[in-house]
Amino acid sequence: AASRPRLAVASDAICALVATTVTIVVSAFVVPLAIKSVVLASLIILVPGMSLTNAVREISSQHLVSGMARMGGAMSTLLKLTFGTIAATQLCAAVGITARDFALPALPTWTDYPALLVAAIAFAILFRAARRDWPVVILAVMVGFLATRWGGAISGSLPGAPVGVFLGGLLLGALANVYARFAHRPGAVIREPGILLLVPGSVGFRSVSFLLERDTTLSLDTGLLLITLLVSLVAGLMFGDLLVSPRRSL
């Protein structure tokens, strides 16, 4: 796609088509797989969760033109990914390849923490952070994830996911400004990698997928959850800026 501009427009749909086809074939002939989970895991790097979050942040800051443009781009990416997934499913069914979506047992809870460490290192590579910033990026990812999980656990009668995401965004926003104030480095070094595990890109992908599968009730429910999580995360970041304001604008 980098060397073929015309291919770049359809790259998201092609990636989804290939990933879904490979998953269905492997599940049908090699080993049973939880197809939806495997497809989502393979496409998660392309799901525009960060773009959706940035769009809501810009709209809430009254940058309406750039915010709506970013929102439109994110929605078009979601539609292309969903189209590729559904097209692959229909093509496999047309040639007689069908695979049941197996419900595999969940991994033990302790596996979350080694996976979190691996994800934090991967995010440092993904953001092309300088070597000196790697410890900060890794710590930010861990803090954001753990704050969100623990915030949801102590939410009581309140909805766990929105409360956890709000507290995670609040803590990361405040820590990013503290880092910018005292280390004289951009607060984005903490903020952007830290919220990457909090952005609801997978929720948006599932909402559009349910809609194209004509499951409108589940699509609407998931879409409302997407909006709730986006608002909670952006509100947390805004209140973090109010809690600790950066002394320097970097």
Describe each PLM feature range.
Residues A1-V199, S207-L250:
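Alpha-helical transmembrane segments and their membrane-interface boundaries
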